[in-house]
Amino acid sequence: MSVAVLAFGLNHTSAPVSVRERVSMPVDLVKPALAGLRSAFGGAVREAAILSTCNRTEVYCAADAAVAEQLPIWLADHHCMEAGSLHPHLYRLHQNDAVRHAFRVASGLDSMVLGEPQILGQMKDAVRAAEEAGSLGTLLHQLFQRTFAVAKEVRSQTEIGAHSVSMAAAAVRLAERVFGDLGQARTLFIGAGEMIELCATHFAAQHPRSMVVANRTAERAESLAGRFSAGTMKLADLTERLAEFDVVVSCTASSLPILGLGMVERATRQRRHRPMVMIDLAVPRDIEPEVGRLDDVYLYSVDDLGRLVQSGTDARRAAVVQAEAIIETRVQGFMHWMQSREVVPVIRGLHQAAEDVQAAELERARRLLARGESPEAVLEQLAHGLTQKYLHGPLAALNRSAGDERKQLLAWMPRLFPGRDSRR
């Protein structure tokens, strides 16, 4: 059975954050998941890679096409979910659609922030994890190498990333909606990853009254805080100190909420009900969604920011058209490469069969020469034997065929076995 490129998963357009957080995979769980996927399907899934970010969880496979319908069931089972609850949010892509999707994702065309560059790095991390897990083979390796090349081509030849509103900039805008000038705002960042670093950069440009970084690893918190003359604190101190802050931006890799309803409710009472902006960029979420019901708290999720960053998309519509044209050309190129791979075993088989005939006829000729036969007679017998073997296959196929099959064979014969007329 031929191997197909398959992709399935969900993203910010097909599933809300409440669903995405249930299938999100931290980096340390990706390799075990890949091992479980290949084990569940045996040889039917030859290669696999998993891309899991705040906005998407996707699985790319080189697999037998017959298992395509069972793959989403595995994803649901892996996360202890009912397949029916996940099914409405999933997309399943096959062959050129899967290839096109990979190219679009890496190029930023499928991102919440159109043209954002972070997704390319995240996809490279996913490929690295698959390589380390031993689940990347020739087909997916070629797919992702071409994916990265396409993303570079799109970004260098179009303005897909120009004039975009980043998630970090959107976070600042949301805080400004509540407080106006942020010059007097005390800002807390929970986490110390790339997204928090971007947010800290944008907030620092507004010169807030103070900035503090809280992170599980003190060394990383101090490193980030040092760039912005910010303070640091332990996550364990959140309960006591949360009330100090007007703006809280959180993005960690925690599998459970860090800020619960009770903790935030106590903080609002200590603040005497002064407003608090809380921006949760994590998937799974760092802040319990029930916090948004509190009168004095303005809670925004990653999806809320996504709606804000859609502004400016119209201005980049021409760049999108250019990018899609580049991608379509490269999709066709990859599919041609895949089709050429399917021919390779046939060509090898033909060469091997021809070499076997050649070896047998040469051995027969040597025996005849050893017995004293004249070289001229041996050469004639060698030529005759090769001719008979050459013609045996096609003539036997013609003799066995009938009707439409015979018509097709007759039509192909001049191309497969060009005669004197075809060389004129």
From Swiss-Prot:
Substrate binds at residues 53-56, 111, 116-118, 122. The keyword Transmembrane helix does not apply. It is an enzyme of class 1 (oxidoreductase). It comes from Bordetella avium (strain 197N). Belongs to the glutamyl-tRNA reductase family. Its EC number is 1.2.1.70. This is Glutamyl-tRNA reductase. Possesses an unusual extended V-shaped dimeric structure with each monomer consisting of three distinct domains arranged along a curved 'spinal' alpha-helix. The N-terminal catalytic domain specifically recognizes the glutamate moiety of the substrate. The second domain is the NADPH-binding domain, and the third C-terminal domain is responsible for dimerization. NADP(+) binds at residues 191-196. InterPro entries: 4pyrrol_synth_GluRdtase, 4pyrrol_synth_GluRdtase_dimer, 4pyrrol_synth_GluRdtase_N, GluRdtase_CS, GluRdtase_dimer_dom_sf, GluRdtase_N_sf, NAD(P)-bd_dom_sf, Shikm_DH/Glu-tRNA_Rdtase.
